[in-house]
Amino acid sequence: MKKIYGQAYVNISRKNITLNLERVLKSKAAKKYFTPKRWVRKKYIVDNSLHSFLNAELSKQYPNLGNSLKIYYINQKCFNDDLKKEEELYGKAKDMLSHEAIILQRGLKDGTATHESLHCLGIPHSFSERNVLFFEIAFKRNYTDNIMDYSDMYGIPTIATWEFQWYAIQRFIHALHTGKW
């Protein structure tokens, strides 16, 4: 994460916090988010309710983290209830311009946390229509080394950001730190 943000001349400080959910997971309200094997149910990631649940639990234990990006690392697989099998989901930002992202087991050892945190800051996929709207440019999917592409799945490491992304990253980080977001 530091390498990618460093390209934009942004120094990030990370604070790792362990959110103990063992007691909470025994409640009926929490059980819906997980299978009996404790796999995360995809539908609750997609509809953002798991993000909201984790935020509520985090706020109970750490009430002063409002203006922070929160990356929830969950070392579990993702389960698709409709297909009754594992979903190959690495992670998901709650929304563009949000404060939270969830990173699942598949995304723990690659650039998923950085990719999703950049979505939280409003940085779209390099190949998307949103990228055209935001930056007036888009690139062919899976052909760049940009962290916001998916080319790492095809042998091209996603190790770079581009100068036009740097300014957006800097603006959003500044807004986050000054409480203007």
Where do the PLM segments sit?
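Extracellular (secreted or membrane-anchored) zinc-dependent metallopeptidases
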Residues: K3-S13, T18, S27-E116, C120-W181
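Low-complexity, acidic Ser/Thr/Pro-rich "mucin-like" tracts of secreted and single-pass surface proteins
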Residues: N20-E22
